[in-house]
Amino acid sequence: MRVAVIAVGRLKQGPERELADRYFERFDEAGRKLGFRELSIHEIPESRARDAATRMAEEAAAIGAYIPDKSILVALDERGQNLDSTVFARHLGRWRDEGAGHTIFVIGGADGLSPELRRKAKLAIAFGSATWPHQMVRVMLLEQLYRAATILAGHPYHRA
C-alpha cells in the first residue's frame, strides 16, 4: 500500500523539517518490511484568495489532483477523532490487509480543509482538541506513521 501525505504549505528548513525528515526515513525503512511502499509528501501552495471559503476551495482542488481513484482519504482535522496509537496502527494495518492501493493523509492550511474534502474522508483524526500549526501536525503525523509501523512489527519503540 502506498502512503502519501498531502499538506497545504511548505515545511521550511529548520528543526521541524529535520524532525519530519527523520520520521519520514524511519517509516519508509520500517514500512517497506510491512508492505507499505513509497511514502510520499506533496506540498500544496497556500491559496492567496481573500476569503476563507475561496481559499479552502482552491486548496481542495489542488489537493484533489494528488488523490488517486479508490484511495482511502484521511483528513487531519481538529474536529476529528482522537485515536490512540494502537487504534491508528490497526486502521493502517487493516487498510493494507484489505488491499487498499493508496492511503492519503491530508493536512489543510490556515483555514483547514474544505467541507467537501472532509466529507470524502473515510476517517478524520485530530491530535487532541487544540489547534496546531500545519508544520507540527506534519511532524506528529509522520511520527505516528512510524509508531504504527513499529506497533504492527512488534518493535519495542511503542511502550504503552
Curated annotation (Swiss-Prot):
The keyword Cytoplasm applies. It catalyses: pseudouridine(1915) in 23S rRNA + S-adenosyl-L-methionine = N(3)-methylpseudouridine(1915) in 23S rRNA + S-adenosyl-L-homocysteine + H(+). Its EC number is 2.1.1.177. S-adenosyl-L-methionine binds at residues 76, 108. It is found in: Cytoplasm. One of its GO terms (molecular function) is rRNA (pseudouridine-N3-)-methyltransferase activity. CDD domains: RlmH-like. GO terms for cellular component: cytoplasm. Keywords: Cytoplasm, Methyltransferase, rRNA processing, S-adenosyl-L-methionine, Transferase. Its main location: cytoplasm. The keyword Transcription does not apply. HAMAP family: 23SrRNA_methyltr_H. Homodimer. Belongs to the RNA methyltransferase RlmH family. Specifically methylates the pseudouridine at position 1915 (m3Psi1915) in 23S rRNA. This is Ribosomal RNA large subunit methyltransferase H.
